[in-house]
Amino acid sequence: MTKVVVCALYKFVSLPHFESIRAPLLAMMEQAEIKGTLLLASEGINGTVAGTQEAIEALLLWLNSQNGLDNIVHKLSFDDEMPFYRTKVKLKNEIVTMGVEGIDPLKVVGTYVKPQDWNALISDPDVILVDTRNDYEVQIGTFKNAVNPVTETFREFPEYVKQNLDPAKHKKVAMFCTGGIRCEKSTAYLKEQGFDEVYHLEGGILKYLEEVKAEESLWEGECFVFDNRVAVNHDLKKGQYDQCNACRMPITEAEKQSPAYVQGVSCPHCIDKISDEQRKRFVERERQVNLAKARNEAHIGSDVNQVIEARREKKEAQRRLAAEKNNAKKSQVL
């Protein structure tokens, strides 16, 4: 069986005319039968795609021929099945959304630390180690003694820093994420906030798992990935987790035995959070999936990730509105 090559890539680079790249890039991906999503913004490119080895090599060559997109940071892994259903190239305001204006990793960023040097750094008792990923990612694996900010989205990270980190107290801060891109912005943000010694794992967790032997590793658990593999183990192979198709949370085999788990409809993480309308929609979607399987057809279904992201953005907007009202009340008192 031919292995599917999964390629995670990103590059921060000024792309003032990024909109013009979308059409030819999408056409190239479709012609090569590459699946997955790439994001384009004025600050660069980011995404994960999959295809044959020849197709991925062709994509990297194509990107290398485009002005500014040469030498893109990328990491390869392999799967027995295609982990994506669609081919997308999206235009965005940011290639990784922090929601803070003026943060530019091209101007200021933390110190890159090679995977081979990472263990020594995070073993330093003076270093505070922060996992910049979302809580559901951290739950299934992280580095030993890492701090979990318990965020739902990367947008919440600046508030975590504001409430929990102090440049006068925390002299050395080390951060990490899946592939390195979130740390480009998180370290840039901390530098802007006055933190001096700020470090991040070059290439992210995936590069560390690739280059550091398991017996020498300080990684504990599995690494969440944003595709149908759900998580990968230290060998970068599909791990033990499945994913709830309703809320996209990673779930164990034990959780799938729970009465709250109904395939495609609910799990212990979301059973009390989804509405009756959502439940009906998920039941119908699962019925369509099963019908497609019976006909030996692929069923793409609705983009649940968009639903989840919309829900999180709504909650974030509500939090911002509440904070603005609270600040307004304080101003009136003063």
From Swiss-Prot:
InterPro entries: Rhodanese-like_dom, Rhodanese-like_dom_sf, TrhO, TRHO_N. Pfam families: Rhodanese, UPF0176_N. Its EC number is 1.14.-.-. The active site is at C177 (cysteine persulfide intermediate). GO terms for molecular function: oxidoreductase activity, acting on paired donors, with incorporation or reduction of molecular oxygen. Residues 123-217 form the Rhodanese domain. PROSITE patterns: RHODANESE_3. Keywords: Oxidoreductase, tRNA processing. PANTHER family: RHODANESE-LIKE DOMAIN-CONTAINING PROTEIN 7-RELATED (PTHR43268:SF3), THIOSULFATE SULFURTRANSFERASE/RHODANESE-LIKE DOMAIN-CONTAINING PROTEIN 2 (PTHR43268). The gene is trhO. This is tRNA uridine(34) hydroxylase. SUPFAM superfamilies: Rhodanese/Cell cycle control phosphatase (SSF52821). CDD domains: RHOD_YceA. One of its GO terms (biological process) is tRNA modification. Catalyzes oxygen-dependent 5-hydroxyuridine (ho5U) modification at position 34 in tRNAs. Belongs to the TrhO family. It catalyses: uridine(34) in tRNA + AH2 + O2 = 5-hydroxyuridine(34) in tRNA + A + H2O. It comes from Shewanella baltica (strain OS185). SMART domains: RHOD.
